[in-house]
Swiss-Prot record:
It catalyses: a dipeptide(out) + ATP + H2O = a dipeptide(in) + ADP + phosphate + H(+). The lineage of its organism: Bacteria, Pseudomonadati, Pseudomonadota, Gammaproteobacteria, Pseudomonadales. Residues 4-253 form the ABC transporter domain. This is Di/tripeptide transport ATP-binding protein DppD. The gene is dppD. It holds the Pfam family ABC_tran. Part of the ABC transporter DppABCDF involved in the uptake of various di/tripeptides. Is also involved in the uptake of phaseolotoxin, a toxic tripeptide inhibiting the enzyme ornithine carbamoyltransferase. Responsible for energy coupling to the transport system.
Length: 324
């Protein structure tokens, strides 16, 4: 059984007539699996995970057939029941560590707060465990950093502190939302290596939200590609990179600079992602898709399974007779 199973998730901001920012999403993650969610800004990647964590506030609202994590339907859990899971069995590392950390408290206090709440540690054991966590995320001179405030740390150090807080209770699922945003290339590589080492050591599932397809190709076992709030393709690595089945996935891969060597321009799709007031009747990619036919413009395709994953397209690429 999957550790995480999301069925027909929708997220709206406003009333029931509002256009969903996430629409009909199905997604699963197995224990110990590394799943990447990719797509351009505004595709619904972060909102999907915030809905799972219970972080969508009014006027936003969440609906789903179920949001099942480790046997619990997160939609039906009350506040206290949810708090026993979120932050303990399921944790999240946010995009910007400088805003994710509270500037009014030392990093040691913030790590200790997680340990007090979820593990019940007190006194010397609490302090020692906080120190061990800083050492585990490879912060130099960890003992002296316990009493430091977030503004006294670099971006890379702050991200390591955020990771230490997230893994403090040894979660079964860690969600990393653009964990290398605003970090230089060297630090990005170190943070990704750290996350993957922790994932292997603790045998936890990892959901990686990213724009970086190179990172995905090197680290993920499966990929969910999102466009305009929908999952358009789900597949394994490297098959999804070698033989993408959705035109949008193909376009993302073609836009990688290394694939455009010698060209005057990067490969791009014409047009822009549809907004609230210009969503097409049919497939959301149809106004931009080079393969679109009249059927695509009139009806919206469902996400259909095939032997290598799933695709939301009437005329999938590289499949021949594989569609179930």
């Amino acid at each position: 059984m999957s550790l995480l199973d999301i069925k027909n998730l929708s997220v709206r901001f406003g009333d029931t007539t509002a256009v969903p920012v996430v629409d009909g999403l199905d997604l699963s993650v197995d224990k110990g699996e590394v799943l990447a969610i990719v797509g351009e800004s505004g595709s619904g990647k972060s909102v999907t995970m915030m809905a799972l964590m219970g972080l969508i506030d009014a006027p936003g609202w969440v609906s789903a057939d179920h949001l099942r994590f480790d046997g619990h339907d997160m939609l039906t859990l009350k506040g206290r029941q949810r708090r026993r899971i979120v932050g303990k069995d399921m944790a999240m590392v946010f995009q910007d560590p400088m805003t994710a950390l509270n500037p009014s408290y030392t990093v040691g206090y913030q790590i200790e707060e997680v340990l007090r709440l979820h593990l019940g540690l007190r006194g010397k054991a609490l302090r020692q465990r906080a120190l061990e966590l800083l050492e585990r995320v490879e912060i130099p001179a960890a003992a002296s950093r316990l009493d430091a405030y977030p503004h006294q740390l670099s971006g890379g150090m702050s991200q390591r502190v955020a990771i230490a807080m997230a893994i403090a209770a040894e979660p079964k699922l860690l969600i990393a939302d653009e964990p290398t945003t605003a970090l230089d290339v060297t630090i990005q590589a170190q943070i990704m290596e750290l996350l993957l080492n922790l994932q292997r050591d603790q045998d936890m599932a990892l959901i990686l939200i990213t724009h970086d397809l190179a990172v995905v190709a090197e680290t993920a076992q499966r990929v969910c590609v999102m466009y305009a709030g929908e999952a358009v393709e789900i597949g394994g690595v490297p098959a999804l990179f070698d033989r993408p089945t959705h035109p949008y996935t193909e376009a993302l891969i073609k836009a990688i600079p290394e694939h455009c060597a010698g060209e005057a321009r990067l490969a791009t799709l014409p047009g822009i992602v549809p907004g609230r007031y210009d969503r097409p009747r049919g497939c959301l990619l149809s106004p931009r898709c080079p393969y679109a036919q009249e059927h695509c413009r009139q009806e919206r395709p469902a996400l259909e399974a095939h032997e290598r994953g799933a695709v939301r397209c009437f005329y999938p690429l590289n499949l021949l007779n594989e569609v179930a």
